Amino acid sequence: MGKIIGIDLGTTNSCVAVLDGDTPRVLENAEGDRTTPSIIAYTGEEILVGQPAKRQAVTNPTNTFFAIKRLIGRRFKDDEVQRDVDIMPFKIIGADNGDAWVEAHGKKMAPPQVSAETLKKMKKTAEDFLGEEVTEAVITVPAYFNDSQRQATKDAGRIAGLEVKRIINEPTAAALAYGIDKKQGDNIVAVYDLGGGTFDISIIEIDSVDGEQTFEVLATNGDTHLGGEDFDNRLINYLADEFKKEQSLDLRNDPLAMQRLKEAAEKAKIELSSASQTEVNLPYITADATGPKHLVVKITRAKLESLVEDLITRTLEPLKVALADADLSVSDINEVILVGGQTRMPKVRTEVSEFFGKELRQDVNPDEAVAIGAAVQAGVLSGDVKDVLLLDVTPLSLGIETMGSVMTKLIEKNTTIPTKASQTFSTADDNQSAVTIHVLQGERKQSSGNKSLGQFNLEGIEAAPRGMPQIEVAFDIDADGILHVSATDKKTGKAQNITIKASSGLSEEEVEAMVRDAEAHADEDAKFEELVTARNQADGMVHATKKQIEEAGEALPSDEKEKIETAMAAVDTAVKGNDKEAIEKSTQELMEASSKLMEIAQAKAQAEQGQQAPEGEAQAAKPDEDVVDAEFEEVKDDKK
């Protein structure tokens, strides 16, 4: 059986980890980074993911997608989506089923389809490390993700060619990463997870008995549309307002300028975590009839904190609710773990520390802990990790709509999963032959205030006065937190059941079509990779040849030099095209044309060696003081 990998599919950055022996290991991607920006660009020729996508975002803002996780499993008309429509440089549209989709080069795409590109890169990173195909994964989601968002995440995994063995909550994964090597005693841990697009708080009890560890989630709460992106947006809007005051021009109407502003705001926010002041300097940000305009704004840490103060305060209310749900007070919490890049902001750390009245743990990497926890859970599922039991909860209450548009709860929030619950209902009218089961998720009493997950009909109920038929509705939540609902007429035994896919979401046919599309692109991607390799080899050959020509100097006859330069020009022309065979052929011809250069280089080397021999013999008697030349690879520091 192949390895099951652990993936943290983040709003801003994603990360992949795998068990290496019995130790979780975060893997470096092709660029040498341990985290990958969750940015996907469609250039018209190819799909770029991560750092390459980020680099070209300024020149291709309308086809470069970031923070796509904020749209996953959401309806276009949702208030949170409408807020993003106004500020994102790319196009967010309403799909036929009412979902929020995006558009690139006129092609409409579902968020799971776009997120699948990030998952594919994570899959490839793991395959490069393991040297074998990877087909199974544990993927993390915010604890406060609803059923639709969890289902959409599983769809993204399928489109990427992964069987999602388990969906696990991000704070729970972080607690696994923290607690897996701490075998002693019992601990109650608060995991404060403020990532790029989502916020979660989970209260988790870690028990160690006779070498067995139990991670039990006592309560969870959060906001799936609050994160680092919102902090960035406050800064972006501030910069745009300052520019408008000074120049009477609104940069919000210019996608290219907004993309540059976004990059600058993110950079400034990160700098202000260690510096007390920074300057945003963007020359030629736009132009009008009077000429080009430049943006230069100084920002202090205090100014940034004042811009985002209410966002930080917004995270404190869920903390109070989670503690109340767990029936605990602040003094009952033993450790506080911070997860998510936005927790590096000093003001966030101060507020959380003051709320809990204790020092924060500093030994958990906020960018990598979630992926490490996912890899541990993957190890539990594959049997590589023993004596670990994970008891997660459902974040929101689940129920059905009953008479008077009331939500009747069958499963309360913070119930340990997997779980089952059933209740018997009846008809509202005499001789009613069918009932509609409308499944809801949320905490409001009124049905319309909750998230509609889907509905189905139970038909063929025997004629009877209202209140007489006995209809049993059963809810079954699996370990992924995904809901299965059934309704049974107790008298006739007629039953109807569904796995909730949300009232919208992707149909089975759509997911399969996207899987096929992804497989077709895999062939294209492989061909493109071969083309890039051929181009790189050709460029390398031209560079080396030019250097050899310089070194050869007068020793190279002019006719030979002319022949080589003609061959180099042919390579340059071929590299600009898309014909791999033509590039390889011209590279080979350049190698053949350069044979004279090789002869000259060899003769020169032999001559130098002959001169150095006596000197070398004299040196041999001395102690070895030579410095050995070595090539060192740059080890990139952990990024935000």
Swiss-Prot record:
Gene from which this protein is expressed: dnaK
Family to which this protein belongs: Belongs to the heat shock protein 70 family.
Induction, per UniProt: By stress conditions e.g. heat shock.
One MF annotation (Gene Ontology) recorded for this entry: unfolded protein binding
Biased composition (Acidic residues): 626-640
Pfam families (UniProt xref): HSP70 (PF00012)
Chain coiled-coil ranges: none
Keyword DNA damage: no
Tagged with keyword Transport: no
Listed SUPFAM superfamilies: Actin-like ATPase domain, Heat shock protein 70kD (HSP70), peptide-binding domain
InterPro entries for the chain: ATPase_NBD, Chaperone_DnaK, Heat_shock_70_CS, HSP70_C_sf, HSP70_peptide-bd_sf, Hsp_70_fam
Domain of life: Bacteria
Residue stretches of biased makeup (Low complexity): 601-621
Annotated stretches, region: Disordered: 601-640
Protein name: Chaperone protein DnaK
Role, per record: Acts as a chaperone.
